[in-house]
Amino acid sequence: MQNELQTALFQAFDTLNLQRVKTFSVPPVTLCGPGSVSSCGQQAQTRGLKHLFVMADSFLHQAGMTAGLTRSLTVKGIAMTLWPCPVGEPCITDVCAAVAQLRESGCDGVIAFGGGSVLDAAKAVTLLVTNPDSTLAEMSETSVLQPRLPLIAIPTTAGTGSETTNVTVIIDAVSGRKQVLAHASLMPDVAILDAALTEGVPSHVTAMTGIDALTHAIEAYSALNATPFTDSLAIGAIAMIGKSLPKAVGYGHDLAARESMLLASCMAGMAFSSAGLGLCHAMAHQPGAALHIPHGLANAMLLPTVMEFNRMVCRERFSQIGRALRTKKSDDRDAINAVSELIAEVGIGKRLGDVGATSAHYGAWAQAALEDICLRSNPRTASLEQIVGLYAAAQ
């Protein structure tokens, strides 16, 4: 009897310990530096790939931006089938169309070349094509799935960090909501960070994607699942963004600033992929899907308000964020002010009312935010009424 009791106690302790275990994972290979896109063919060849399905931003392809990628594949004798991705955030109908084309072409791997929307779509495609009996809506982070197709991710904006995360966000065609799926299989095999590909990104897009990266870093640093690994990446990314984003927005051909932003975006992605995000993302997904506004802009409109809500449980962490942004002694309020000032400096200091949001939206949006997986790692619990109030405060 005593042995049974002892075993039960140890099992209980083991269960409690497992609940405290935190993970940290990054892609196996990350290449960076101007011109690094030329390494894509070698990376594909190393993995034994013969025919790649290239999902590329349609505008970038038309502008000739995929030429270097094409050359690197041709030199290695690797065939490619091009799939121009539609403009805007990925919808499940577009993803399913790409899956059908990939199956028909017989490709053995995928390259994603574009912004976060293209990368998210490609991640979903690689998973769905090898799991034909499952839908994204049915999948969860604990789903047992067949291995996805090999994936090489080449971001052309500095923001989502999708090239280094285990997350994809796809708009459901029926509900209009954003489906957020986190799964270990969604982590790309290779991330190629070539800052030269980001030089032509318009200033307003640079600003929005940059604030998205800042939001990733701040939420990862504040998250319940933060670890020393993710803390180092997140606070480093915050400092880099504070220094480099105004330069990248103001002078797009500043390659050093562009590269710094691309690295910061990647670091923030690594951080939140393990630590999680928070209430700002849970809330931002709703107006983004309903009003079709860019994700980075939605984050910019909500981040200071959500930080004020979380401040009571994040005082020391916010003080460190303030120091990272202002390079001087700061308190928690200074951090929120510094974030607001940076958002205004890069020209996207808008309110929800400016993009068509009204109080009639807030109840449904708040309910959807409560169901968003990003909320799980927020440092402070939020009720439906509190989230409605936060939307109203950002009006």
UniProtKB/Swiss-Prot annotation:
Pfam families: ADH_Fe_C, Fe-ADH. It catalyses: ethanol + NAD(+) = acetaldehyde + NADH + H(+). One of its GO terms (molecular function) is ethanol dehydrogenase (NAD+) activity. Its cofactor is Fe cation. Gene3D superfamilies: 3.40.50.1970, Dehydroquinate synthase-like - alpha domain (1.20.1090.10). Its main location: other. One of its GO terms (cellular component) is bacterial microcompartment. PROSITE patterns: ADH_IRON_1, ADH_IRON_2. NAD(+) binds at residues 57, 116-120, 156-160, 178, 197-201, 295, 354. Pathway: Amine and polyamine degradation; ethanolamine degradation. It is an enzyme of class 1 (oxidoreductase). Fe cation binds at D212, H216, H281, H295. It is found in: Bacterial microcompartment. Keywords: Bacterial microcompartment, Iron, Metal-binding, NAD, Oxidoreductase. Its EC number is 1.1.1.1. InterPro entries: ADH_Fe/GldA, ADH_Fe_C, ADH_Fe_CS, Alcohol_dehydrogenase_Fe. GO terms for biological process: ethanolamine catabolic process. May act on the acetaldehyde produced from the degradation of ethanolamine, producing ethanol. Active on acetaldehyde and isobutyraldehyde in vitro. In vitro works equally well with NADH or NADPH. Belongs to the iron-containing alcohol dehydrogenase family. This is Probable alcohol dehydrogenase EutG.
